[in-house]
């Protein structure tokens, strides 16, 4: 009887866990111990890819024989990274800055079995509509998106702040690009549509 290898999500993010649950594959979530400090001159896409691989490898080293998923997301406007605001004041300032502008989200993904690693970067372009202070305040009070880069949760009320969104994978904006991920998992022998044997 063939058994699928154990699947691990190298993340403590509840958003990524919820996304992976959609694939109906059994998995566990383990928080990786990775320094997320950007390197000098590192481009946002390179940072997201490096961190996704580092997270996957950090967990894979401790769990040989498992398939490990690492991911990271970096948001930028005009090439400058936008972090997680942490509190109301910084979130308000961030949303004022993003009003009427396009934000580029790099959602990087790495899958490894410890021997071989695949990676991808899925880009999402979000155009924010012009935002009034009243709209910003109402949104922040309703959703408190202080742990989200760009201060807007597209999977929730944050979608009301958007004018448009472009991406090859509509799930990428939430931080785990499922279209790219399912292709990678199939190449590692895990297919969500195939019953475990």
UniProtKB/Swiss-Prot annotation:
Subcellular locations according to the entry: Cytoplasm
Enzyme class: hydrolase
Keywords from the named record: Cytoplasm, Hydrolase, Nucleotide metabolism
TM spans (from-to): none
Requisite cofactors: a divalent metal cation
Domain of life the protein comes from: Bacteria
Protein name according to UniProt: 7-methyl-GTP pyrophosphatase
Organism field: Bordetella avium (strain 197N)
